[in-house]
């Protein structure tokens, strides 16, 4: 394995070291190449002036996009008073990091000459660090000069000052026929079955359209597609006849492929042809006309001048097998799907697993961004502009001459400026507002905030991949299972426990989703290369067919030809040789070409549909392995991996082995591989560590003075771990430490260490162990105050930051923490109610103070004054960061790197701590019972290794699955300890800190890297006596900031019931919650119909108690005697009884009464 490790580091570490490479490549490729491809596929906008409208000098207007152009981020107009915009400025000013988008638009009036003009469509958000970012190509020093982290890798958008990441989603494999069963198909009609074959067809501009062939009980096939969120079912014969002029016999022979003896297939094909006979279609034009007549109502780009045949052509080219432009290729693809459907129905092949990675692709952020942008650009012309033109024609002051200057008139141009805002809204909310839904199964949850709690959490956002929000709502667990096909592509360890388990995964360390095309393949040249290797090209002559003993060759969803069964392996091996060696002089085959060979099983039933499947498109999972035949690195995909023999180690190599893993650790994600000696731990503990590593206080960044994150945790005195993994070095994780090396003794001491609690040495605590801070940033914009001005005053200089409080107010308010300019003083302390900002109102000539509302003490860390885009010096915004001290207190959580989580139970004086013969007292004590049930042997090994490293004065760089002499890792580090005069097993004689006598047992003591988690008592402590209550239920409101109550849930209730604490239960859930008194009618049992009638007799003299206290008892008694409780239903007052009841019960009775449901109560005396 040593040779493999060197081979790995030398050859490919640079390739996948960039954590967010797939995000950046996808965006750059989408914007630089595919945006103009989308432009070519967009239909022109044809506008025919209605006859009843006023004459405007023309009858028909045609507009279309010719090309798009993107600029660089800047402020101000191009070539006029502009300056370069950098991400750091956008963060501090809470702006969006955008680039200008320009379009060249052609227009034509009737038969006049074509004219063109260039227009700015708006500013769209851009991704940081690469092609469309001003940080591209900057060195570490230049990055630091621009206010960025020296190790900044980009891959995110900046929207309103926040870093947003478009998360990766799993989608069905593109341009590949997938056979499956779905019970929902049965609901479409009486003849429908649950068998289907679907293909997610994706065009070169990433536009997707899924078509599904469904098997009917009579043997025929129906094609299903969704267009603008509507489902359409079309007989397959109608599509086949429209794509190609052919006879029924030719279609019959192409599907049957010489198997005339199989009566079952023949009957099914005859059923397909019978549907065509019923529809009276015999040639291509008839089929197109029928399709066009049915779909012209819903198709975009159809005018009254468009014929049914042209509408049918438009439907076929834009919605059927859109990954290819040729009708011939579309026809062959549908025939191929019918073949697989019939084979699945006949049980000749197994159904495909939609949850397998082999049947999946990844939807990258840049590709999704392009799909949304393309749709918005299309809607701008075809929907927004059409509505605007219709509105202009109906204006009473319509001017025909101005109307010709279409798209140059700002009134007509208004729809275009919304493109940037819509893209910004998508990134800010993660919600997809789409006319077509982009062939996706969800409309929300696409974007997440790239929060920098620590560096590990931040980088994991770029490696996470989600199964889809649709599956999170399902009760089935099959989508969550870890399948063998995921080996090397999806990390088996790094997934959260709880609701998202198995749905939110992380790609492995070596997995690289392809974000861009390595090279665009010339299909004709590639067909010739395959022909030289032995492929027979598919013929346009439908009479020439190949029987089922041939392998079909499919390239990116296009059926190219067939290969004989006997030469299938040699054909694939020859193609793999050209891929690995790049020895083709005329035409180089992409290194990431997928060569998936599924051979015949040799039995009557195949596990998979046999064929040779080639793919070169982006958005595929790939990873590098070592090809043993050619001694080079080969990039493979999940479908390709299933039929390869890949050895993990040197000992696994057999004569049949073709490939070998570069490093066994490559199956783990970056976060999972950071854990040291993880292979010696119980598996769930490694899962817990992946989550806790992302909840640790540490060093989130190095450009602290330029960051304005809403909330940031920071450890004041972090250490580099003495024992670290090679992954931490390769990915620069060690530059952002998130823990402390602590001397840990495993001993039961004082009794405060039960149930995972831990004892911290008080002197270590005083030296700064675990000390941290929390930063919160706030922004105050004068524009917001200006917009709230009364009486329509819009003066931009009404409000100023100025400490101009009157002498009368100064005597009442302490302003020592506010500077003369009205801004907070850096370093000043803030307490609740203390002024933190002073704004002067120039209109009312008075000062307005903004007061600190938090109950916890804090200090001003930084203050930033930012200008506005209107270049008005008085139109400012102020940003300031507040620092909260977070020293460890009892109840705060700590954890090791092995999933051992515990809370601080007590700070124990150093004089009472146990000590070794060398006089070393531990920083931390944990109970020995933490290990047997958790089986985290890796933590014990780490303790020995770090102890050895500290004695030898060196860092220990280890790696998961690393081999040691005689496979004895304890012996390896034990000998190092023995050489330094310490015990072989890491035990030492310790003395009692209280009595000074030796302890009877040797104590295991060493050095462990401990992490402080963000779950702190200071953030969660909550208590109240009385406080705000809910208006409807009269129960205490929830929320710590609102002064709400503590949640008393079902488990708490059950515990009191089990203890029989009835009075305590009554006090907590009734008297201290929503206690109320009311009346219940004993006759009808209603608590809603009773009311109190206080009738004062005419002979009674009412004396207020406040005027005559001596008559208070008499007066109260008189009023009480005159109260009458009457039931409105029964009209009686003798049967109403006063009871104590929860107010929420009264609320429930009212709600049920509104639905016609009556609650009846019975009153008994106990």
Swiss-Prot record:
Matching SUPFAM superfamilies: beta and beta-prime subunits of DNA dependent RNA-polymerase
Listed EC numbers: 2.7.7.6
One of the GO BP terms on file: DNA-templated transcription
InterPro entries hit by this protein: DNA-dir_RNA_pol_su2 (IPR015712), DNA-dir_RNAP_su2_dom (IPR007120), DNA-dir_RNAP_su2_hyb_sf (IPR037033), RNA_pol_bsu_CS (IPR007121), RNA_pol_bsu_protrusion (IPR007644), RNA_pol_Rpb2_2 (IPR007642), RNA_pol_Rpb2_2_sf (IPR037034), RNA_pol_Rpb2_3 (IPR007645)
Chief place of localization: nucleus
Self-association and partners: Component of the RNA polymerase I (Pol I) complex consisting of at least 13 subunits.
Protein name: DNA-directed RNA polymerase I subunit RPA2
Organism, scientific name: Euplotoides octocarinatus (Freshwater ciliate)
Gene it is expressed from: RPA2
């Amino acid at each position: 394995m040593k040779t493999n490790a060197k081979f790995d580091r030398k050859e490919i570490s640079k390739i996948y070291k960039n954590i967010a490479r797939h995000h950046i490549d996808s965006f750059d490729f989408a914007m630089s190449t595919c945006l103009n491809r989308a432009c070519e596929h967009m239909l022109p906008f044809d506008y025919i002036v209605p006859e009843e409208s006023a004459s405007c000098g023309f009858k028909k207007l045609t507009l279309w996009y010719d090309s798009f152009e993107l600029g660089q981020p800047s402020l101000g107009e191009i070539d006029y008073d502009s300056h370069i915009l950098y991400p750091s400025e956008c963060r501090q000013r809470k702006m969006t990091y955008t680039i200008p988008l320009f379009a060249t638009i052609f227009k034509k009036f009737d038969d006049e000459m074509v004219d063109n003009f260039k227009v700015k469509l708006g500013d769209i958000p851009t991704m940081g660090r690469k092609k469309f970012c001003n940080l591209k190509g900057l060195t570490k020093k230049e990055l630091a000069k621009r206010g960025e982290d020296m190790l900044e890798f980009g891959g995110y958008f900046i929207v309103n000052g926040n870093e947003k990441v478009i998360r990766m989603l799993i989608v069905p494999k593109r341009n590949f026929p997938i056979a499956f069963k779905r019970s929902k198909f049965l609901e479409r009609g009486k003849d429908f079955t649950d068998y289907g074959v679907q293909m997610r067809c994706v065009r070169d501009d990433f536009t997707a359209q899924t078509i599904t062939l469904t098997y009917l009980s009579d043997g025929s096939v129906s094609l299903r597609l969704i267009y603008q969120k509507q489902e359409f079912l079309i007989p397959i014969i109608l599509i086949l006849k429209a794509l190609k002029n052919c006879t029924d016999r030719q279609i019959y022979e192409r599907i049957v492929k010489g198997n005339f003896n199989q009566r079952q297939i023949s009957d099914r094909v005859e059923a397909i042809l019978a549907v065509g006979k019923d529809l009276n279609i015999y040639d291509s034009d008839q089929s197109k006309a029928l399709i066009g007549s049915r779909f012209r109502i819903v198709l975009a780009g159809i005018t009254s001048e468009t014929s049914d045949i042209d509408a049918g052509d438009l439907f076929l080219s834009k919605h059927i097998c859109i990954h290819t432009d040729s009708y011939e290729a579309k026809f062959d693809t549908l025939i191929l799907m019918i073949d697989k459907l019939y084979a699945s129905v006949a049980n000749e092949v197994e159904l495909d697993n939609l949850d397998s990675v082999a049947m999946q692709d990844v939807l990258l952020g840049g590709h999704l961004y392009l799909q949304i942008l393309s749709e918005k650009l299309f809607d701008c012309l075809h929907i927004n502009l059409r509505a605007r033109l219709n509105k202009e024609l109906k204006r009473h002051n319509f001017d025909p001459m101005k109307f010709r200057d279409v798209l140059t008139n700002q009134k007509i141009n208004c729809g275009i400026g919304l493109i940037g805002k819509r893209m910004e809204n998508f990134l800010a909310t993660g919600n997809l507002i789409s006319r077509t839904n982009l062939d996706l199964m969800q409309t929300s949850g696409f974007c997440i905030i790239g929060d920098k709690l620590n560096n590990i959490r931040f980088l994991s956002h770029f490696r996470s991949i989600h199964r889809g929000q649709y599956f999170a709502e399902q009760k089935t667990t099959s989508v969550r299972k870890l399948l063998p096909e995921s080996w090397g592509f999806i990390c088996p360890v790094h997934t959260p426990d709880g609701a998202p388990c198995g749905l939110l995964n992380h790609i492995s360390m070596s997995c690289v989703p392809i974000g861009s095309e390595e090279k665009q393949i010339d299909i004709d040249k590639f067909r010739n290369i395959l022909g030289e290797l032995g492929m027979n090209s598919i013929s346009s002559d439908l009479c020439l067919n190949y029987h089922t003993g041939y392998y079909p060759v499919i390239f990116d969803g296009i059926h190219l030809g067939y290969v004989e069964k006997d030469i299938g392996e040699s054909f694939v091996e020859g193609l793999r040789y050209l891929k690995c060696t790049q020895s083709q002089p005329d035409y180089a085959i992409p290194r990431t070409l997928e060569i998936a060979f599924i051979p015949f099983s040799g039995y009557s039933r195949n596990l998979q549909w046999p064929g040779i499947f080639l793919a070169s498109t982006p958005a595929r999972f790939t990873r590098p392995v070592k090809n043993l035949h050619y001694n080079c690195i080969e990039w493979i995909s999940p479908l390709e991996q299933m039929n390869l023999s890949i050895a993990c180690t040197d000992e696994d190599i057999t004569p049949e082995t073709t490939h070998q893993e570069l490093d066994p650790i490559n199956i783990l994600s970056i976060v999972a591989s950071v854990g040291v000696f993880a292979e010696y731990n119980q598996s769930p503990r490694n899962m817990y560590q992946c989550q806790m590593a992302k909840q640790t206080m540490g060093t989130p960044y190095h450009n602290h003075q330029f960051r304005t994150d809403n909330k940031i945790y920071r450890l004041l005195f972090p250490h580099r771990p003495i024992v670290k993994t090679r992954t931490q070095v390769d990915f620069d994780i060690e530059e952002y430490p998130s823990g402390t090396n602590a001397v840990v003794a495993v001993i039961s001491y004082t009794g405060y260490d039960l149930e995972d609690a831990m004892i911290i040495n008080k002197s270590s605590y005083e030296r700064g162990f675990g000390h941290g801070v929390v930063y919160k940033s706030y922004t105050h914009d004068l524009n917001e105050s200006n917009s709230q001005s009364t009486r329509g005053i819009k003066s931009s200089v009404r409000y100023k930051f100025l400490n101009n409080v009157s002498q009368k107010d100064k005597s009442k308010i302490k302003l020592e923490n506010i500077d003369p300019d009205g801004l907070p003083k850096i370093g000043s302390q803030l307490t609740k109610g203390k002024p933190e900002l002073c704004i002067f109102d120039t209109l009312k000539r008075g000062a307005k103070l903004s007061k600190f509302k938090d109950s916890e003490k804090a200090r001003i860390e930084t203050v930033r004054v930012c200008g506005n885009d209107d270049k008005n010096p008085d139109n400012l915004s102020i940003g300031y960061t507040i620092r909260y001290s977070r020293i460890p207190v009892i109840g705060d959580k700590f954890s090791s790197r092995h999933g051992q989580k515990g809370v601080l139970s007590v700070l124990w004086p150093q004089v009472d701590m146990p000590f070794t013969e060398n006089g070393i007292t531990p920083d931390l004590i944990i109970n020995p019972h933490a290990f047997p049930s958790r089986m985290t042997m890796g933590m014990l090994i780490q303790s020995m290794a770090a102890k050895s490293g500290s004695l030898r004065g060196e860092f220990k760089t280890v790696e998961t699955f690393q081999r040691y002499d005689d496979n004895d890792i304890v012996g390896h580090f034990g000998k190092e300890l023995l050489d330094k005069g310490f015990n072989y097993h890491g035990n030492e004689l310790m003395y009692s800190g209280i009595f000074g006598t030796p302890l009877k047992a040797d104590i295991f003591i060493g050095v462990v890297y401990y992490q402080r988690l963000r779950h702190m008592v200071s953030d969660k402590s909550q208590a109240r006596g009385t406080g705000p209550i809910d208006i409807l239920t009269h129960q205490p409101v929830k929320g710590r900031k609102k002064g709400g109550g503590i949640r008393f849930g079902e488990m708490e209730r059950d515990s009191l019931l089990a203890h029989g604490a009835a009075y305590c239960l009554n006090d907590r859930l009734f008297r201290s919650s929503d206690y109320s008194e009311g009346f219940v009618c004993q006759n009808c049992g209603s608590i809603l119909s009773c009311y109190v009638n206080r009738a004062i007799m005419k002979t009674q003299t009412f004396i207020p108690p406040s005027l005559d206290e001596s008559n208070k008892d008499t007066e109260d008694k008189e009023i009480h005697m005159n109260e009458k409780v009457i039931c409105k239903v029964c009209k009686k007052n003798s049967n109403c009884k006063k009871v104590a009841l929860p107010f929420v019960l009264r609320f429930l009775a009212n709600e049920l009464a509104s639905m016609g449901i009556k609650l009846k109560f019975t009153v008994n005396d106990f």
